[in-house]
Amino acid sequence: MTNLLEKFNEQQIQRLAKEMPAFCPGDDLKVTFKVVDSTGERIQIFEGVCISKRNRGLHSSFSVRKVSHGESIVSQFFVYSPALISVQVMRKGKVRRAKLYYLCKLFGKAARIKERTTYVKKKSK
């Protein structure tokens, strides 16, 4: 039974696979997704900090937090959702935790995350 379920999940992942950039919690993301309203369908952009990432096969998801008009908004997106159009990494963040739920309580400068810098090693002659 579980083997059949695993095969089904693998088929669905292959069918719904999208090109997704590599990102981690702490990164600034720009998520584009479709919203269905009473008037029709429109595209919305949600830009904020990734506070968690959950890798569970077909049920993989990630949470993004942004501050709008002084209120903290956390939105969860499913990786294999047909409503998800694209994800862009705007900035890499330097954090030492996998889940950044403590950021939901912080505002302003306290909620800032340092940028992760990568260095290129020069070849010696």
UniProtKB/Swiss-Prot annotation:
One of its GO terms (biological process) is translation. Transmembrane segments: none annotated. The keyword Hydrolase does not apply. It holds the Pfam family Ribosomal_L19. Keywords: Ribonucleoprotein, Ribosomal protein. SUPFAM superfamilies: Translation proteins SH3-like domain (SSF50104). InterPro entries: Ribosomal_bL19 (IPR001857), Ribosomal_bL19_sf (IPR038657), Translation_prot_SH3-like_sf (IPR008991). GO terms for molecular function: structural constituent of ribosome. GO terms for cellular component: cytosolic large ribosomal subunit. Belongs to the bacterial ribosomal protein bL19 family. NCBIfam families: rplS_bact. This protein is located at the 30S-50S ribosomal subunit interface and may play a role in the structure and function of the aminoacyl-tRNA binding site. This is Large ribosomal subunit protein bL19. It comes from Wolbachia pipientis subsp. Culex pipiens (strain wPip). The gene is rplS.
